[in-house]
Amino acid sequence: MLKKKNIFFKKKILIYGLGKSGLSAYQCLNKKSKLYLFDDKKNFIKNKDIKKKLITYKQIKDEEFDYIIISPGININKCILSKYLKKNSNKINTDLDIFYSLYSRNKNITVTGTNGKSTTVKILYDLLKNQKFDVRLVGNIGNPILL
């Protein structure tokens, strides 16, 4: 895959949500940007390096971030950081935004919607794979997009 300079490099970034998507964003940007991490369930985090980068709600309010990467499972209307995220909505991005900024020159197919995504993606994957295209399944049906 072709890579280009990423707009997320050399920035101050808050990653909110440390499930699969959040951790993959952390791994992708860890040595390229100054990262701050926040998760509602920080007691479950075992990794020492990640624990060191965890910040509190108060610290978040005192910082100015270039970007906020939020995990797909976070409902910005009902989460702990709801008011903060709404106030800073122009800074919110996802792992998909990071991926597309890295690989914008590549041909990508993205399937979104409520019903039928997995079936559609599996059919497309099989069709393209049979034609010898370099294809990968990511997201709900495979690995996080950044891994």
Regions found by a protein language model. Name each.
Residues K11-K12, Q27-N30, E63-F65, G73-L147:
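Phosphate-binding loop of NTP-binding sites
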Residues M1-T94:
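N-terminal leader/targeting and accessory segments in enzymes
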